[in-house]
Amino acid sequence: RGQMEAITINKPGGQSSPAFGEIQKNIMGGIVHEIFTNSIRDIVNYTKEKDILKAPKNNALYDLEAEMENSGIETKTAVTETGKKPKFVGHRYKEGYHVLLSITPNGNRVFAGYGIIPADCWKKGMPVGTLNIDKLIDVSTFNVLIGSLEKENGKVVVNHDSVLA
């Protein structure tokens, strides 16, 4: 977060302004998605000291491909207002390994998890569908790393935890 805030542009008249200060939410979501996906690739490859994962940019079946395993990982990201449910979207409703990340617009709070998400957890729509968080809470193959999924008064609540030191 701090690195992005440090990037500035010069406006007419020489005035300096934050480069990401007035960016649309969906564009910021795309930037978060790319940084997150590439970071997972880099960490896995560094840890294994060889290229295990690739992050193709050609609308491949998966966001992260493990060619030697003929498999992949789908990453889903969302920029989510505090107190709201994240909206993870997809064009394909596949069962498989997913890594989810939701971050608040100011970057201070995060929800993250990973695991196998069944295809029936997706609400189909055109042109994109959304992950049904109400079904996700009952999926035993999904693990929350940061934040929590809880049922309160019959409703599923997604809690984002602070990531500030």
Residue ranges of model-derived segments:
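Nucleic-acid endonuclease domains
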Residues: R1-Y62, E67, T77-A165
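Extended, Lys/Arg-enriched charged tracts that mediate electrostatic binding to polyanionic substrates
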Residues: G72-E74
